[in-house]
Amino acid sequence: MDLLKSPLYSKYVESNAKLVDFAGWEMPISFSGLIKEHESVRYSAGLFDISHMGVISIKGINPKDYIQKLFPTNLYSFCEGQGLYTVMLNDKGGIIDDLIIYDLGIQKNDISELLLIVNASRYEEDFQWIKNNLNMSEISITNFKKDKVLLALQGKNSFGLFEEWIESSISHIPNFGCEYKIFEHISPKEKIFFSKTGYTGENGLEILLSKKAAINLWDFLISKNVAPCGLGARDTLRLEAGMHLYGQDINEETSPYEAGLGWLVHLENNHEFIGRRVLEEQSRLGIQKKLVGLSIKGKAIGRKGCAVLKGDENIGTITSGSWSPTKHQAIAFAYINTSHALINNEVEILIRGKKFNGVITKRAFYKKNY
């Protein structure tokens, strides 16, 4: 089966990017090198093509009323022009996907529109789960992205660069805020969607636009010495920032409480949602495992599946691991037995048959200081 290609595939070829198969897409893992790309985002700005991500449109009169049962988070805690990070759960309280919902407000004829940005590997599952669990006579659900491009401009310089391109200010837009509008000088008939969101721990924007406008933006940013970045740097950046990767750190067997995402569960809202009974029980009785951060001494990298030990006892398993270019040390996430999941608890990590010392930390290893 042929791999899917982004509309910007030709830009990868021009840049001699190293390409890999990611969730059925041929995507760049790196352009100039992971470390250089990582540091570009941390200290200035970097540009990612994330067109492999899925974008689902849900339309209807008050569509939040109909989709609320799919989410443990109160969907009325955000309004038009804002986004909300949340999770979609199965009936066992496991995470089907983590995603962002954007409220585009009323578009026409009293019909409101929500955009869901979902993981590439979960798009088909998400789409079918939504269709199977909702009354489709009340709402419509479509693939919003189609042949559009989704870009992520990340780093402390990202806002200023984007403002230069659109020739207007975005200072009025809050974190997780969004707009969906026409910029006459870019494309007089095209609405461009953008949000102040990202997956790096830095200021950033995610922008959904046509191929023509995307090439315009790509070329503009490259002319401003913004580094094109691949999925390799995206992974190290998100790991430093304490952000989950679906399929590694979370899946249908892990609950929000276990994954450190309990803040997304609004039991006090008293709304019915799929998986509520299981989460009520976990809230009352506690959980057996918990996702934590690990700092590992030495240069060995703890990869997915590596055991975490306390003495002779196996107390957990690593889900994600990497060298941290910012912290200059090996870092990881791991599910640890709750009784051992204590900050500063010293442990050992079994890597390729050898034990390495480590310590349990908070999941976020990096926080921006601006």
Swiss-Prot record:
Enzyme class: transferase
Reactions the enzyme catalyzes: N(6)-[(R)-S(8)-aminomethyldihydrolipoyl]-L-lysyl-[protein] + (6S)-5,6,7,8-tetrahydrofolate = N(6)-[(R)-dihydrolipoyl]-L-lysyl-[protein] + (6R)-5,10-methylene-5,6,7,8-tetrahydrofolate + NH4(+)
Top-rank taxon: Bacteria
Molecular function terms from GO: aminomethyltransferase activity; transaminase activity
GO CC annotation: cytosol; glycine cleavage complex
SUPFAM superfamilies: Aminomethyltransferase beta-barrel domain, Folate-binding domain
EC number: 2.1.2.10
Coiled coil (UniProt feature): none
Keywords: Aminotransferase, Transferase
Pfam families: GCV_T, GCV_T_C
UniProt-listed InterPro entries: GCS_T (IPR006223), GCS_T_bac (IPR022903), GCST_C (IPR013977), GCV_T_N (IPR006222), GcvT/YgfZ/DmdA (IPR028896), GcvT/YgfZ_C (IPR029043), TrmE/GcvT_dom1 (IPR027266)
Listed GO biological process terms: glycine decarboxylation via glycine cleavage system
NCBIfam families: gcvT, PRK00389.1
Function comment: The glycine cleavage system catalyzes the degradation of glycine.
Oligomeric form and interacting partners: The glycine cleavage system is composed of four proteins: P, T, L and H.
Protein family: Belongs to the GcvT family.
Name the record gives this protein: Aminomethyltransferase
Origin organism lineage: Bacteria, Bacillati, Cyanobacteriota, Cyanophyceae, Synechococcales
